[in-house]
Curated annotation (Swiss-Prot):
Keyword hit for Cytoplasm: yes
Position of the signal peptide: none
CDD domains noted in UniProt: M20_peptT
Protein name as it appears in the record: Peptidase T
Annotated transmembrane regions: none
Family to which this protein belongs: Belongs to the peptidase M20B family.
UniProt remark on cofactor binding: Binds 2 Zn(2+) ions per subunit.
Gene Ontology CC terms: cytosol
Amino acid sequence: MEYPNLLPRFLKYVKVNSRSDENSDRFPSTEREENFQKNVIMKDLEELGLSDIHYNQKAGSVIAEIPSNVDYDVPVMGFLAHSDTADFNSENVKPQIHKNYDGESKIQLGDSEFYLDPEVYPNLRKYKGQTIITASGDTLLGADDKCGISELMTFAEYLMNHPEVKHGKIRLAFTPDEEIGTGAEQFDVKDFGADFAFTVDGEAPGKLGDCTFSAAQFTLDIQGVNVHPAVAKGQMINAVQVGIDFHNQLPEHDRPEHTDGREGFFHLLSFDGTVDHAHLAYIIRDFERDGLEERKNLVKSIVKKMNDEFGTERIKLQMNDQYYNMADELKKHMDIVDLARDAYKAEGLEVNEDPVRGGTDGSQLTYMGLPCPNIFAGEENMHGRYEYTVLESMYKTVDVMIKMAELNAERAK
């Protein structure tokens, strides 16, 4: 089905800079995120006539409700989308609309030197005859997750205007700081008030995320000894070299650029240093909890061995878990996954449940007592200048959400 207000909403939202900041001490991490939520999202919800619209200051989230239109109890379903965008230029986004794509040509990003090439991004070929939306080459688009925000709004608009579609109470949430991994930690599950939910933050139509990485992160702070190179023999300890030596003891294959499918990895995010001091930041990913623990233990053992060789704690390790594979918990709630599967199939989609090589807010929320798989939103090539979405994919997301609302009510009779 086509939804005439979806594209204008999306274009409006992507032009608002709501980039999060992992180095911030405030929550939400940026004032611009909070302004986007309060001044744009809340106003649009009010115009749609939803109920219980409020900003939860502690959670940094906008909450709203689509009231039930049936006279019997239905499990309360929720949908979530995040308001922030990733760590890439988000200022002055200029969306470009490419109608009736021919499925073969390169798509120039604005007037820039950059192109979306189907030889590099073969998914483009699937969208022959459809409308591709890109940025202009110097920013990201913000499809992740302003696709989801636009779809939640359009879904709400449709249900409010079509009482013939029977559904129970539906809760909506617009959350901050997903891209930096801190938004879900503060989410108020009780205030949200749903029995189960879905994040709307996935890729191409058919993608259903019910299996994610388990994740940890760690940092190393290395204290070196700086001595003039002329007299350094036997005295200098180069902190940068110590960092290199540590990194080279991790499995060479287990890096993002060498892995796919269900393979995990160690990923060096940053390495800053001088002879005197170095700082390394890593993330660890594995689909199995045991595998995650094995990787963490390997890091600890390497650090211990190197410190033992130095005879002092020259390398300081800080490590913490981030989230766990939602599949382990969703095994107890397969009726929720089945609801999504059935809605996909009813809308003519082939369900793709390949493991998600990442995490979503739902990964954490599931372990906070809110079972929360992820459904597709039409996001492609997220987090950079080559990001794009497809208008027809966004339409299909709304179709699926409407069908899920109907099925949830039917099954409660």
